[in-house]
Amino acid sequence: MCENEKERTLVIIKPDAVIRGLIGEIISRFEKRGLKIVGMKMIWISKELAEKHYAEHREKPFFKSLVEYITRTPVVVMVVEGRCAIEVVRKMAGATDPKNAEPGTIRGDFALEVSDAICNVVHASDSKESAEREIKLYFRDDEIFDYPRAEDWFYRKGI
């Protein structure tokens, strides 16, 4: 549970969202929620990188299809920062299985009804440890930036 501290988390806008033109809509939701994008790029994930990212699923039956899916098209990877960012982003993303995602969440609003739950629009780190590990997989330190936003002023002034 977050104690209202500033955190960073990794978000991946997955192939099903990229090919449907949802990148801007998804980024906009995070920014409107007061989260700050401190790193972002479009990349084509290699098979090797995908296998590192999803290493904890290596022995699961869906591992191969997960790697094939995430390497199918370019994706957008982002480092998102904010108070309790990991928890907030996970709530905004919605249930991992799109069939269970509530309307108003990213997956609830944008995931298509397909038999494969891996086509779920976004990836969001599930813990502080995962976020730190995943951010290091995709970003060098000099690719993550700090800059002021209006929210910083509100928190500093105690409004």
From Swiss-Prot:
Binding-site positions, ATP: K14, F62, R90, T96, R107
InterPro entries on file: NDK-like_dom, NDK-like_dom_sf, Nucleoside_diP_kinase, Nucleoside_diP_kinase_AS
SMART domains to which the protein is assigned, alphabetical: NDK
The protein's required cofactors: Mg(2+)
Subcellular location: Cytoplasm
Family of the protein in this entry: Belongs to the NDK family.
GO biological process entries: CTP biosynthetic process; GTP biosynthetic process; UTP biosynthetic process
Active site: H123 (pros-phosphohistidine intermediate)
Catalytic activity: a 2'-deoxyribonucleoside 5'-diphosphate + ATP = a 2'-deoxyribonucleoside 5'-triphosphate + ADP; a ribonucleoside 5'-diphosphate + ATP = a ribonucleoside 5'-triphosphate + ADP
GO function terms (MF aspect): ATP binding; metal ion binding; nucleoside diphosphate kinase activity
Domain of life: Archaea
Gene3D superfamilies the record matches: Nucleoside diphosphate kinase-like domain
Keyword rRNA-binding among record annotations: no
Gene Ontology CC, one term: cytoplasm
E.C. code: 2.7.4.6
Full protein name: Nucleoside diphosphate kinase
Function: Major role in the synthesis of nucleoside triphosphates other than ATP. The ATP gamma phosphate is transferred to the NDP beta phosphate via a ping-pong mechanism, using a phosphorylated active-site intermediate.
Family annotation (Pfam families): NDK
Keywords: ATP-binding, Cytoplasm, Kinase, Magnesium, Metal-binding, Nucleotide metabolism, Nucleotide-binding, Phosphoprotein, Transferase
